[in-house]
C-alpha cells in the first residue's frame, strides 16, 4: 500500500514525547509529514527524521502555523493529525480510495477509538 499521495500535518506544541512517538510511527510509511511546532524549545530529535519537514516557530498561533505549511503541500490529499492521535495507514488508504471513487466529496473522516489506561487495564470506547 502506497500513501505517497497524502501529506499529514502534525501541529505540535510542548509535547515532544508525543511528537516523537508519532514521528516514529509515520517514518515507517511513505506519507509526507509536515510539523509546524510552536513549542518553546525546538524538538531535539528533529534531525533523526530526515524525510519529515520540521518547522520550529516558537509561540506561533495555531492558525498561523497551518497557514505557513499549507503552501508546502504538493499531494492531492491532506490529513490533519494532532500529536496525540494516530491515523492508521489502512484507514488513510480507505479514505483516499473513497475520495477517488466519489469526486463529489471533498472530505472524509474515519472512526475514532479512545483508550484509557486504569489500574493495569485499558478501556476502549468509540
Predicted segments, located by residue:
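Acidic donor-binding segment of Leloir-type glycosyltransferases
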Residues: 24-56
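Short alpha-helix within the catalytic core of nucleotide-sugar-dependent glycosyltransferases
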Residues: 23-24, 75, 88-100
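Short aromatic/hydrophobic "clamp" motif used to bind/position activated sugar donors
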Residues: 78
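Conserved donor NDP-sugar-binding/catalytic core segment of glycosyltransferases
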Residues: 92-124
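The conserved acidic donor/metal-binding loop of glycosyltransferases
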Residues: 82-86
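Glycine-rich, basic loop-to-helix element that forms the pyrophosphate-binding segment
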Residues: 57-73
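Cell-envelope/extracellular polymer assembly enzymes that use nucleotide-activated donors
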Residues: 5-7, 32
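Short, well-formed alpha-helical segments that are part of the catalytic scaffolds
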Residues: 11-28
Amino acid at each position: 500500500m502506497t500513501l505517497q499521495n497524502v501529506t499529514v500535518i502534525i501541529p505540535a506544541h510542548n509535547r515532544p514525547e508525543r511528537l516523537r512517538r508519532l514521528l516514529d510511527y509515520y517514518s515507517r510509511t511513505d506519507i509526507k509529514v509536515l510539523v509546524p511546532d510552536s513549542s518553546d524549545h525546538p524538538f531535539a530529535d528533529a534531525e533523526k527524521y530526515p524525510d519529515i519537514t520540521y518547522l520550529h516557530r516558537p509561540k506561533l498561533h495555531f492558525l498561523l502555523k497551518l497557514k505557513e505549511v499549507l503552501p508546502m503541500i504538493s499531494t492531492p490529499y491532506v490529513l490533519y493529525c494532532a500529536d496525540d492521535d494516530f491515523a492508521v495507514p489502512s484507514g488513510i488508504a480507505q479514505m483516499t480510495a473513497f475520495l477517488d471513487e466519489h469526486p463529489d466529496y471533498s472530505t472524509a473522516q474515519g472512526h475514532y477509538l479512545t483508550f484509557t489506561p486504569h489500574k493495569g487495564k485499558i478501556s476502549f470506547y468509540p
